[in-house]
Amino acid sequence: MIQLIGIKSQCDIGIRQKFSITSEVLEGKLKYINELVGSVLILSTCNRTEIYVDSNLEEKKLIDTVFYGLDWDYDLVSYIFYIKDKYAIKHLMEVSCGFHSKILGEDQILGQIKTAYDAALEAKTIKGKLQRLFQKAITCGKEFKHICESYRIPVSIPSIVAKEILNMDIRKYMIIGFGKIGQLLFKYLNNSQAQIIYIAVRDLNKVHDSYKKCGKIRFISFKDRKSYYNDIDCIVSCTSAPDKIISKGDLPCRKLTIFDLAVPEDIDRNVLDLDNVTLYDIDNISVIDEKNKAIRKKTMGKYRYILENHIDKFIKWEKLHQLSPEIQKVKKYGDEICEKRITTFKNKKHTKDNDILVKTMIESTARFYINRAIEVMKEEKLNGREEECLRLINKIFCK
């Protein structure tokens, strides 16, 4: 049974980060939960943490097990939601199309789902029905993005931050962290009127040479970042660090705008004690986007039929998949019938006319199933179920 435990969307970032799972511990958590409940995938982004499982555990037992396995504080259980079956399937399809993103319609989530799927594959914690569901969700998200053409309206958090930086006419800034979000920021800001863009990374040797060719870009060591704070007007922090990397004692006495795009947060809230610092977190940034939200909502609603089609297809597949054991049993039985007749043919092919022997074997196989069908018809007639039985037998044997 497909089940989902997730964090309620209205939770603020302070609560969300208590449930976040960093990439460094993801594989270990996947394997541990897999041992406890069965097939599992963990989707953990800056805006959501969702645990998808295919398990027969009942709701409370599953929630207790997941909280224990992920070392979550059970006092926070009121902040989670639980859904299963078609509701969990529908939720995932909506997530893949951007319907549940804080920035409505942003397409980063599709890449994040693919990353989560790859991580579960790598950890060998996903198979069967859950694997098929995520394959379907990724296909659904791609189709929705292509047909809806949501890419024509930049809606990712990095694009909104870049737009705000440009609107503020900030010319000197630092990006801390150069993962996917940092690289997107670089993409949006590289062609701006910036004077200097410092990019702080932990390993300078991993920076591709193509990035170093941009004149106004300067890559610096993460450990040296503080020595450059006096030279900039803005910091965008987007690392995957488990602890805070900036506190008020690190900052100079100059006007600074800081965007914290990390979950868990990179910036200690004590920086708000400084009159010269303006801090934006993920929740603040989401509010900035309200102007275009109505336009995207209308456009996305027009193409909702795409995800409805994918939901229907998966539910139909799921129902048919439940027949797999019976189908295999019928096939095995058929193979046994054929094998007996093949053995008979091999034993007699040198002693009898082969044409007559083949005809006899084929007729014998047909009679076997016809006689069995007749027996079932008689049994069901006596049990008062002949009408449905006759309908099925006619559908199988008669054109």
Curated annotation (Swiss-Prot):
Highest rank taxon of the organism: Bacteria
Pathway note: Porphyrin-containing compound metabolism; protoporphyrin-IX biosynthesis; 5-aminolevulinate from L-glutamyl-tRNA(Glu): step 1/2
Site for Important for activity, residues: H91
Binding locations of NADP(+): G177, F178, G179, K180, I181, G182
Enzyme type, top EC level: oxidoreductase
GO molecular function: glutamyl-tRNA reductase activity; NADP binding
Keywords (A to Z) from UniProt: NADP, Oxidoreductase, Porphyrin biosynthesis
Residues making up the signal peptide according to the UniProt record: none
InterPro entries, alphabetized: 4pyrrol_synth_GluRdtase, 4pyrrol_synth_GluRdtase_dimer, 4pyrrol_synth_GluRdtase_N, GluRdtase_CS, GluRdtase_N_sf, NAD(P)-bd_dom_sf, Shikm_DH/Glu-tRNA_Rdtase
A Pfam family: GlutR_dimer
Enzyme Commission numbers on file: 1.2.1.70
Residues that coordinate or bind substrate: T45, C46, N47, R48, S101, E106, D107, Q108, Q112
UniProt keyword annotation of Cell division present: no
Annotated function: Catalyzes the NADPH-dependent reduction of glutamyl-tRNA(Glu) to glutamate 1-semialdehyde (GSA).
Domain comment quoted from the record: Possesses an unusual extended V-shaped dimeric structure with each monomer consisting of three distinct domains arranged along a curved 'spinal' alpha-helix. The N-terminal catalytic domain specifically recognizes the glutamate moiety of the substrate. The second domain is the NADPH-binding domain, and the third C-terminal domain is responsible for dimerization.
Subunit structure: Homodimer.
Other information: During catalysis, the active site Cys acts as a nucleophile attacking the alpha-carbonyl group of tRNA-bound glutamate with the formation of a thioester intermediate between enzyme and glutamate, and the concomitant release of tRNA(Glu). The thioester intermediate is finally reduced by direct hydride transfer from NADPH, to form the product GSA.
Protein family (similarity comment): Belongs to the glutamyl-tRNA reductase family.
Record protein name field: Glutamyl-tRNA reductase
Gene this chain is encoded by: hemA
